[in-house]
Structure formats: C-alpha cells, structure tokens
Amino acid sequence: MNYPIMKTLILVLCSLHCFAIYGQTKNETFAFHYSNKNYSTFLQETKIKLGNIRASYSAGTLEEKDSCIHAAGILLEESFTKGAFHFWLGTEWDFNGTTNTPKVGQIACGYFVSTTLKHVGFNLNRYRLAQKGAYDEEVYLCGKQTIITIRDQTPNDLKNYFKSNLTRGLYMIGLANHVGYLFFDGKELYFIHSNYGSPDCVVIETFEESEVSNSTIFCVAPLSNNKELMRKWIENELIVVP
C-alpha cells in the first residue's frame, strides 16, 4: 500500500467534508470574501485595514479612539468569518501539529487559535500561548475578568445562554480538553476549531452538532467585543504569555 498517497487522499476527503459542513450554513455568516485571493494577500489587506484604524486611533480624541476600537472589533470578526477560517478549513489536525501555513502540515487545536491570531496581527508568541491550557490561554489573551465559566450544561444550553445574555461576535472557548473559536451571529452558535474528532481537521460547524462539544465545563471569553484586547491589537502591544 502506498501510504503517502493514501494520506493525501484522506486529507482531500477530509477537506471536502469540511467544506460540506460549511455549505450547510446556507447564509451570509461565513460568506468567503477572499475566495479569489491567496492567504498572503488576505493578510496584507487585513494589515492595511488595521493600519488605517491605527492611524485614526493615534490622532483621535477619546471619543474617536472608542470608535476605532469598535471598528477594530468589526474588522476582527470579518477577518476571521469571511477570511482566515476559510483558508484554514480542512487543515489536518494532529495533537503535536504546529504548522504556520494553512492546508500544509498539521495543526493542533491550541496552535490553530494562536497561529491565526498571530497572523491577523496580534503581537504574541504563538508557541507559548498554544502550550497553555485553554483557560490560561483566555486569561493571558482576553483577561480573567472577561471569562464566563459554565459548568455541567449541554451544548444546546450554552447556545441558549448566548441568545439570552451575549451579543453577536467572535469568542474563544475552552472545553475540558479542547479549545477553539465560537462565532455567534445573533441566532446560531458556530464552532470553528481544529477537530480531533471526525473529520480530524479544521472545521466550521454548529456547536451543538459538534462531536467534541460535550464537556463538563465551558470557558467563554470575548474577542471582537473585548475593548482592551482590541486596544492592544490597534497599538500592537505585546500580549505577555509567561
């Protein structure tokens, strides 16, 4: 048996399955704005947009700075839901995966989070952040005071909690043995993560349908709605991870 060819075939099938999951969303939540461009072009355009916000922020009044922080939150949300996630979709999962390039090599769940954040412009060490536990990742990135901890609830309970208590935006979620992104569009709760279940690759799926979403604990922290984190992104401030 030709194992390299079999591995390639499995990865291709995995990618197709991941795209099939994406296709089931059937709305504009994850409309891919960069389908005719490569990853480097997408990152460069994100850098330019962030630079424009940074220039306005630097010259702005307190009120204008607050508007820039809001604009950065919108940019972060769109950079992921309509850009970064799609480039990484189908990248093979591995517990020790640390690839820096989408669809080339393997990526572990923590490295998927830290690497994509690094790529869109956060000043952080992707290795140190990924090597922390999910809760500690959220503490260093988002701030301990922003974390919502929910115990002994089902994935559907978490979705209902979002509907009742939280607003549209990009979030980070830590589970008992896993970490990834959540995106809440006001109605549906999506889980974007490097999946160790089936298929074992980066996927976009509804949270309650995920094979790995059953957990005794959910730790949720805001990203796009996190003013302090958006300030750090704009100011290129180092996110310290011991």
Describe each region flagged by the PLM.
Residues M1-K26:
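Bacterial Sec-dependent N-terminal signal peptides
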Residues L11-V12, F122, L170-Y171:
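Conserved active-site beta-strand-loop modules that form the wall/rim of enzyme catalytic pockets
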Residues F19, R128, N195:
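Residues at the C-termini of beta-strands that transition into short coil/loop
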Residues T25-A130:
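N-terminal capping segments
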Residues K132-I204:
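...with weaker cross-activation on analogous glycine-rich loops/strands in unrelated enzymes
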Residues L189-Y190, S194-P199, V203-P242:
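Low-complexity, Gly/Ser/Thr/Pro-rich intrinsically disordered linker/tail segments
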